[in-house]
Amino acid sequence: MLKPGMILCDRYEILDVVGAGGMSIVYKARDHRLNRNVAIKVLKPEFSNDKNFVTKFRIEAQASAGLTHPNIVNVYDVVDDEGIYCIVMELVEGITLKQYIEQNGRLNMETAINFSIQIASGLEACLLYTSPSPRD
């Protein structure tokens, strides 16, 4: 786990943990070269020595980097800093849909439709970009 104040690639300063998934941890960081906050998705250390996981992580980064859509975060950089594998992305401040529902209760029809349209629009962009096969 990276610590606040740690610098990656002489550029990205780790500020805080944003969240974690099965194979990665997401940090809020400061890009000192471009003077902006970013999200950095870091492959967990237990997977860093596994060539298959590193390959999957790089493929994810490359696939994400090619997508441009208002409902999909932008990928800015892919980093390998002494065995620390990272995807540097646009930082989206706010709450998750789950948190929104927990705070506001059940979605009314108009809000549910609005969110669904935004999600579907982002998914459509992913599908068009990746050219899925019938098995997908």
Each predicted region: which residue ranges?
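Flexible N-lobe loop architecture of eukaryotic-like protein kinase catalytic domains
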Residues: 19, 59, 68-71, 84
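Conserved N-lobe loop of protein kinases adjacent to the ATP-binding glycine-rich P-loop
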Residues: 30-37
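Conserved small/polar residues in nucleotide/adenosyl-binding loops
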Residues: 129-136
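Activation segment signature within eukaryotic-like protein kinase domains
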Residues: 115-116
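AlphaC helix of the eukaryotic protein kinase fold
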Residues: 44-66
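Activation-segment/catalytic-loop signature of the eukaryotic protein kinase fold
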Residues: 78
